[in-house]
């Protein structure tokens, strides 16, 4: 007893809480001290003590023990506030849907996480012995996330697809859930239960398929003698050391490893922990290891390529069924992992960024040169810092220094005042291995119907110019302008024209015309019978020509059948002249009317051209003009491209009335092709020039070598060998007209000839007389008659001039590319117009095509608008308003902030329902014409202010007058007596234009005063319609804002016509906002806005549909591709593994795929040197794809924290990639094209027959690979038994019973383990292949070096791990 006491005195007294590790240490020390039996006795006593104490404390769990966290209330409130602001920004078009979703998820996730962190301290402070606290934090029962759901908040749930439900559950289970929350909660929690049931079977099936693929792979040899390997570099910093060690341990080296001249490891040595650590410490360059990929045996594997057995740590035994082990090791974790979803009840887990908060109130300062402005993934403006940034916060007396790590977002501006705990920066969340990201497509759908417009800064990806898909190069808005679409197939609208007014509820079209006093009854019948071609003078009654200011409609005469081959800015009017029909030689030709891309014509610009078929040639040749001195009207060089507009500058006004064409035959051949004729030799017709082309004409051959091609020209004609006396110009040829006499034969020439001197050698020369085809240029078809002249003369003196010009210069050689005909002369229509009488010059015209449907036939019009240039008139000095205007005259402000509008808040709607405007648009399918019927019922108007000075008699009356059918711009006519008014009209050039309008009372008999206004639509058309007429501009949904009348005294109003306005950008003194939309009318005291909804789109997004296309509610507008983190559980992981193994691709092809392939090709040639670059390319492709497949599968399992050795996956991947597809050419006598054969078999056959074999590497899924094996018995026992057996019987297949499954089915001995011995003698003679081959075959050795020693290539593959 005393001894015990003495010992006890020596023992250390511990007074600590004991946890698992301390317990382990204690037990091990007890065992060391007392032995096993005594220790177990002590531990028993401990257990009893524990139970006693627990009984005495009487820990029980009651509902009162669930204490909620006090700070929860304001945290939730704060999050709701943030969500509200976010919703507003989305509505204004500042952030798009993906950013909104992403941010709302992060707001709620961080709130929930914050609560979770608060939980523990809260318990510790308020009630440290709380049973819930003791239980969950000691690890006895329950974990933090479950307690968090009880007392914190349940937070965000994920739906069965693993997507987020962005409505958070704010309550916890202690408080009880609301109905919505309960339903969402059940939705999420049910997922766990269902998944477990469903996925267990999936995982089982996956295992079965995997085992099926590799069941025959057994270790059958010690060494296959391969010299290949896969290189791994320990210096490669991208790969974590842990993964590197995992990759290397248990493998076998494929080559000796030297450190300088010292060999530190030899070939075929297996790598242990010690060796790996040596590699890492010595930082060896490249380690070449053997893997199942490099094994040379076709249907089994050798010990050295497999490496160590995972069970006993030595090299794997002969006869071990490594295939089945591999299949099970991949399939098994799937079954285990499915059960994990169960416990959290579908609560979403994801990552958020960490925040840096301000330590105190104060002014923040940092170095602005170190940061760059950017847009965060939530759409907020921020600064990005690339290096460590030091931020100082200066409060009353203290300076705080905050260090912000690199690659963080700074969310505040310099010198801004920040409050304590305000978020000033966001640290990018480090990508943790647990939640891997994936690319998701998100479609944005339209909420309203209308017309689609883009902001001005949307470009097309060049390859999609005429397609329906547009990529965005930079952030911009997409607008859906309101309006109600109708299809034109409905009867009542078949006669309406663009910009007509019509009654939306009327069933017959006549009512409109008759109810309109300006059209009489017989005109209606006239129009109904044939609305276009009756009498052209009558048409002026119609709204288009006399109502729209500055719009000339040029439309074709009636005899033309108008077939519009539409492109975006050109169409062709085909027609056949009567002379052509007789000949019927040429195909249908037409006039192409072409509009410049920006729609602007300058003076003298070509507006249509016609390719006359008489001036077409099939063959190549040279054009010459009548004499050498003459010039063409237009040289090709003088067609100056001016902003995409072809413009004429007539240089030589000499009229060319004839030109000559000298035919020749030209062949352009590849540089490598063999030519069968000599230079300057003379050949006959139909001679073979190359292996597969013959000459069409006879004559002299001229061969010229250009950069990469050979140009072979054949000149036809007679050959004369002249005497000494003849003097022929040494220069290029001479044209000899028919009248002249030839010096030699002195007989008259019937035709023009062209004499050319050819000198094959220095002394000899001969003369080639070549035939010439003369062309007279006549007036041809008078194009101007196609367009009625009187219409053009009527207004603004638009003229069309016909110009013929020769497309090729004098002596220029024309080349026809592969049988296309060459047009020699093109007839052009040049648009010109005279100056106005007043002398105001019109610089440019805008062209656009208008389509109008009448009587079921669509007609196309070309509309040419003359746009007056914007000139600012400065008013006279004595005008009191002009001094104030002077300063704001040319200011160019940011268009968003240049709007100052003073509307009154009261909204008055007093319009009746039945007015509307037709606006025609081209639909998606070109045949069906769409109309937008726009009713004026949606117009908003904000009434006049107090400041507006009206004439006295008007003040008594209400300024709003009920609508009569044809009044006013929006159906309102304000009766205001005659007075001066001026207003600003700002075109796109942002130069102020002040118009003084003086209205003459005598002209208006209908009402005392009419509004004047301008309206501009997207083509830049400016209207100045007459309110009495039957045309009303498009009242889409219009918002009419009244501005302040005396704006000269207060501020000048700047609004661009056609400008898009976002909601909430123009904040005025009075504090009212505009709605979002497009500005249509600027008036002296008001502005009209067509309401529109903006959608933000960021770069890389895909737009659907064309500009100006009609959008219905629910149509897809934009597709975003964005990355998001998956919620971490294997239910999403398993299908991923399956996708990779079954080779099903769901990824969208990345936009820069081609570039990547190109750079990869360049890299291969750079590494391998060009000679056999692509021979090895095929092999490398297979290697590369195998490695990336392994990486993909590993990524999924690693994200779940499951470790699978690479070699298991490699065995499977080797089977998937082991087959190739025989292509059509080559080996036709052995294999059928399209047959699947083994890669090794293909190579062996190729070697045996010494013939090249063409094949394509394929990826088979595991199911297909199981059905394409050597053994039909194994295939039949897997799937499709009847089909497989029937096929095998018909083909007479033989099963060699090499695998396990066949032997099991037939009850034989399986060839693995002990049964392997009976199998050995087959392969004994190949047992050891001498390794000298490596030294003998130098070339193969070098290839091995080149292939596998280049780090560049495989670094990229392995780094993805």
Swiss-Prot record:
Disulfide pattern: none
Cofactor(s) needed by this chain: Zn(2+)
Single biological process term from Gene Ontology: DNA-templated transcription
Chain residues that bind Zn(2+): 224, 295, 302, 305
CDD domains in UniProt: RNAP_beta'_C
Enzymatic class: transferase
Enzyme Commission designation: 2.7.7.6
Record-linked InterPro entries: DNA-dir_RpoC2_beta_pp (IPR012756), RNA_pol_beta''_euk (IPR050254), RNA_pol_Rpb1_3_sf (IPR042102), RNA_pol_Rpb1_4 (IPR007083), RNA_pol_Rpb1_5 (IPR007081), Rpb1_funnel_sf (IPR038120)
The keyword Transferase appears for this protein: yes
Coiled coil: none
One GO cellular component, as annotated: chloroplast
Gene Ontology MF terms: DNA binding; DNA-directed RNA polymerase activity; zinc ion binding
Keyword tags: Chloroplast, DNA-directed RNA polymerase, Metal-binding, Nucleotidyltransferase, Plastid, Transcription, Transferase, Zinc
Catalytic activity: RNA(n) + a ribonucleoside 5'-triphosphate = RNA(n+1) + diphosphate
Main localization, broad class: plastid
The record's free-text note on cofactor binding: Binds 1 Zn(2+) ion per subunit.
UniProt superkingdom: Eukaryota
Function: DNA-dependent RNA polymerase catalyzes the transcription of DNA into RNA using the four ribonucleoside triphosphates as substrates.
Quaternary structure and interacting proteins, as annotated: In plastids the minimal PEP RNA polymerase catalytic core is composed of four subunits: alpha, beta, beta', and beta''. When a (nuclear-encoded) sigma factor is associated with the core the holoenzyme is formed, which can initiate transcription.
NCBIfam families: rpoC2_cyan
Family: Belongs to the RNA polymerase beta' chain family. RpoC2 subfamily.
Stated name of the protein: DNA-directed RNA polymerase subunit beta''
